[in-house]
Amino acid sequence: MYSRKSLSLISKCGQLSRLNAQAALQARRHLSIHEYRSAQLLREYGIGTPEGFPAFTPEEAFEAAKKLNTNKLVIKAQALTGGRGKGHFDTGYKSGVHMIESPQQAEDVAKEMLNHNLITKQTGIAGKPVSAVYIVKRVDTKHEAYLSILMDRQTKKPMIIASSQGGMNIEEVAERTPDAIKKFSIETSKGLSPQMAKDVAKSLGFSPDAQDEAAKAVSNLYKIFMERDATQVEINPLSEIEHDPTHKIMCTDAKFGFDDNASFRQEKIYSWRDLSQEDPDEVKAKKYDLNFVKLKGNIGCLVNGAGLAMATMDVIKLNGGDPANFLDCGGGATPETIKQGFELILSNKNVDAIFVNIFGGIVRCDYVALGLVEAARELEVRVPIVARLQGTKVEEGRDIINKSGVKIYSFDELDPAAKKVVELTQN
């Protein structure tokens, strides 16, 4: 739901426990949009952003820079990852953010960026594909602040986090000078009052001349958060600008997240989705109506129920193992969903074993057992499978497994099953 930075910041502000922060990360189900789309949305709400244009070819980059009619330009690779400036491309070309001074430079840099993968600390070694660049005018900043809006899970209310120290790693600010971080809790029934917007603006450290526009920007950012079903609005930096005739305050970098559950009423926003930026297995899982998040371990997990899935991963860790994924097949575990889940798990070449943990309430364990046996045969599974089944029709389920001739280690209890799957991966 939130970026790692925001979750860490909330935790340091005493709003979320570490456990809740991890759970929120593992349940990430939101849309992120490219920077040029974020700027488009901000402008629709009357919020200042540096003038700029996206480009999808080197020739378009040349024309975009020409249209801006200045030698003070920035070109940014459009990839949904942090740390673009410190990243590098799969060709060895350095940095996803470059200062440029001419249309020809824009074209030359775009050639290096477009249709290549940008690799940062957040992407892993594969990187993220770059199919667009964003060319913007450089602005002269007088002061940089930080502002984010998100839901506080503790109070169940929207919360604004503000700091007069922006344009840097906000986590470091929270550690070094926690008093520099201000929090404002908003009653959803009342909304953001003009007075609170002014209080937030005042906390950002802008000059008196810029206070009114800053308060208006805060109000409009909150409108975006509420009207567009956002899960996160993060502006870093929110800048006071010098020598600009149109705006004293500008969002010079923005990050948004939008709630997937509201996609049906945010069709325009969701038309901006870039599937090339998402993990293909997670995209496939969504089509299957499975909740899947890839992790870094070697034990594939298939479980029904998010809470049981979290507990299963905990038990694996407690026994010295490392989960390769979070996979909740929900209350509709069927032979088909079992097979789809196995396909997702086995697409990860790091998986050395599969752990199936099913509690049969609505779900019948004999159906699950049939699915396990069919999936193991059809997919020619070569890694060990450990299955812990409990609940409705469990005896019939165990009987199906035992008579199948397929090598599946069947258990009644969770802890012995977890120990077995860890043992199998270690041997």
UniProtKB/Swiss-Prot annotation:
Substrate binds at N304, G361, I362, V363. ATP binds at K76, G83, R84, G85, E144. Its main location: mitochondrion. One of its GO terms (molecular function) is ATP binding. Belongs to the succinate/malate CoA ligase beta subunit family. Heterodimer of an alpha and a beta subunit. This is Succinate--CoA ligase [ADP-forming] subunit beta, mitochondrial. The lineage of its organism: Eukaryota, Fungi, Dikarya, Ascomycota, Saccharomycotina.
